[in-house]
């Protein structure tokens, strides 16, 4: 307790985190893209290479997963306006939301129904390509749909993949790895939903369950993989490859906006609200968005009050040297995808200058908004995916933040507020009914 008091003396906001209060923190260390980019350690070239790799795999994905065929083997989600939800939020919270609210439906991405279909699938494909190229079975000029042949499945079956997950990352990596032909083991934390484990097992994936939280599942997965030279461990806490898989979203969103005739510039700012667990997904997406829109995009991470690991790490500057458990928080939340106690040190250090802020919200707030979105827009998400929905009213109420950035009323009126919906498209009906029953 004495240590917590010392921490609070240095970092007053920790008191609100410990009290599980809904908290908003605007980052005083935010810089321009030009100043912040060198600290990421990755470049636009890296993201372009990821884009090209996904293009090489498109013919394979179009055949392996027919639901991607219409998009030519591209795994991408829609952006939709949510005017009725915007009005409902204004009514419920008594706060005008200037500008227009949009929803990015990664919740309905093909293959695994979550944002993790971006990073998880990309890293599995990257590993498969590397093995096939090294073995001389493939060149980058080939039509990658040859990977569907029995010879390739046979080749990949000598190798295995392991990952630790609270659910969605395991789902995307498990389904993709099994399709390629890898043997795959997913180490699941205690908060992983039963239906996600069942779905993985139906794809022939080995699921190892733990009574502990996410950090333990990752650690055990890492250990198990170390003893097998043919086993590749996908490290959600440190993976640059996962990060780049998410980052591709930036250019793609820019193209979607161009198609819709939506302008993002200094007088039409873009605010993006990203649910955050360990940080890889939102970190990678935010990096891609910064490369695509520069200083005209403002990114915020959203976390449960019971799992504010990234806010704690970035705000104190301690990053992965501190966990929410260290300050007496239990890391138990209905937002299972965000139930992470210790943030990625890589993502925190890479992105701390490129985030405008972080905030927390209560589980009940997520349930309430889950219900409102279903009522108003007919869109059903899992609790985690609503974390971003609390962002617009917080930003519109934050006069000091607006003044610091010099936003005029006109600019705010021209703003786009993009809420990144991270999952929920594959939640079974009975489970969804339970979620809806918890909203007020």
From Swiss-Prot:
**Gene3D superfamilies cross-referenced by the UniProt entry:** 3.40.50.1100
Q: Which domain of life is it from?
A: Bacteria
Q: Which reaction does it catalyse?
A: D-serine = pyruvate + NH4(+)
Q: Quick one: signal sequence residues?
A: none
According to its UniProt record, what is one Pfam family this protein matches? PALP
Keyword Lyase among UniProt keywords = yes
- PROSITE patterns cross-referenced by the UniProt entry: DEHYDRATASE_SER_THR
InterPro entries, alphabetically?
D_Ser_am_lyase, Ser/Thr_Dehydratase, Ser/Thr_deHydtase_PyrdxlP-BS, TrpB-like_PALP, TrpB-like_PALP_sf
Q: What EC number(s) does the entry state?
A: 4.3.1.18
* Transmembrane is among the record's keywords: no
Which keywords does this chain's UniProt record carry?
Lyase, Pyridoxal phosphate
SUPFAM superfamilies found in the cross-reference section:
Tryptophan synthase beta subunit-like PLP-dependent enzymes
UniProt-listed NCBIfam families: D_Ser_am_lyase, PRK02991.1
Official protein name in the record: D-serine dehydratase
Specify the species. Salmonella paratyphi C (strain RKS4594)
């Amino acid at each position: 307790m004495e240590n917590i008091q010392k921490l609070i003396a240095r970092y007053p906001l920790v008191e609100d985190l410990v009290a599980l209060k809904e908290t908003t923190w605007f980052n005083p260390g935010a810089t321009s893209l030009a100043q912040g980019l060198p600290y990421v350690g990755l470049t636009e070239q890296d993201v372009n290479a990821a884009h090209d790799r996904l293009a090489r795999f498109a013919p394979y994905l179009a055949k392996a997963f027919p639901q991607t065929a219409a998009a030519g083997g591209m795994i991408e989600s829609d952006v939709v306006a949510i005017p009725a939800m915007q009005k409902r939020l204004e009514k419920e919270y008594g706060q005008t939301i200037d500008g227009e609210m949009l929803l990015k439906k990664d919740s309905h991405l093909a293959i695994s129904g979550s944002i993790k279909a971006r990073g998880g699938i990309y890293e599995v494909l990257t590993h498969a390509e590397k093995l096939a190229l090294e073995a001389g079975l493939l060149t980058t000029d080939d039509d990658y749909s040859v990977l569907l042949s029995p010879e390739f499945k046979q080749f990949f079956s000598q190798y295995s993949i392991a990952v630790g997950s609270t659910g969605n990352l395991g789902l995307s990596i498990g389904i993709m790895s099994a399709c390629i032909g890898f043997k795959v083991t997913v180490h699941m934390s205690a908060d992983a939903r039963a239906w996600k484990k069942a779905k993985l097992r139906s794809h022939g994936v080995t699921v190892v369950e733990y009574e502990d939280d996410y950090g333990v599942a990752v650690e055990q997965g890492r250990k198990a993989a170390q003893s097998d030279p043919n086993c590749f461990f996908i490290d959600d806490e440190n993976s640059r490859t996962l990060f780049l898989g998410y980052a591709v979203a930036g250019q793609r969103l820019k193209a979607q906006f161009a198609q819709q005739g939506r302008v993002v510039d200094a007088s039409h700012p873009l605010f993006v609200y990203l649910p955050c667990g360990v940080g890889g997904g939102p970190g990678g997406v935010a990096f891609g968005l910064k490369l695509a829109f520069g200083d005209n995009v403002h990114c915020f991470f959203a976390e449960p009050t019971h799992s504010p690991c990234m806010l704690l790490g970035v705000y104190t500057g301690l990053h992965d040297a501190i966990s929410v458990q260290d300050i007496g928080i239990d890391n138990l939340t209905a937002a299972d995808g965000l139930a992470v106690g210790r943030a990625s040190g890589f993502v925190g250090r890479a992105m701390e200058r490129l985030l405008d802020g972080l905030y927390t919200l209560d589980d009940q707030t997520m349930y309430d908004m889950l219900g409102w979105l279903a009522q108003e827009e007919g869109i059903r998400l899992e609790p985690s995916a609503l974390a971003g929905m609390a962002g617009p009213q917080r930003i519109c109420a934050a006069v000091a933040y607006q003044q610091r950035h010099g936003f005029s009323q006109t600019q705010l009126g021209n703003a786009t507020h993009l809420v990144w919906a991270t999952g929920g498209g594959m939640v079974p009906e009975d489970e969804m009914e339970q979620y809806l029953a918890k909203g007020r």
